[in-house]
Amino acid sequence: MKKFLIFIFCIFAFSTNADEKKTTFTKELFNKAQSDGKVVVVSSWLKYCSSCASQMKVLNKAKNEFDNIEYFTFDIKNKEIAELLNVQYQTTLLIFKDNKEVYRSIGETSRDAIYKAIESSI
């Protein structure tokens, strides 16, 4: 019983972290950010996904460290957005600059790798 309660706690802890500081993706916000000349970072997630929570923690920190970047997330179950961005898996990370996709990864949670991708897009 104790292990079960710990398991349930972990699920809620990860789902809470995955929802922190995110701006939900919409085509309108995405297009506006691009027309404003911002670098746009988009990540896909799935509730109760531990790697999604890990990636989101890195992105939340990056959000405070990099200026002129817009961050969006979307639930991978949203098929309309997934098809628009050609995303098939949660933890897909996309970076757009000058209206072009300049970076794509699946499952990347390393702070160094994510920061390097963002820095090279600025």
Put a short name on every predicted segment.
Residues 4-12:
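Sec-dependent N-terminal signal peptides
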Residues 10, 17-37, 120:
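N-terminal leader/targeting and pre-domain segments
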Residues 35-47:
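Short active-site neighborhood of thiol/selenol oxidoreductases, capturing the structured segment around
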Residues 97-122:
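Non-catalytic, surface beta->alpha helical segment in thiol-disulfide oxidoreductase systems
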Residues 52-65:
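Typically the conserved alpha-helix immediately C-terminal to a functionally engaged Cys/Sec
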Residues 44, 67-80:
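Thiol-based oxidoreductase modules, predominantly thioredoxin-like and allied folds used
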Residues 44, 49-52, 93:
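The canonical Cys-X-X-Cys-His
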Residues 85-94:
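Structural micro-motif
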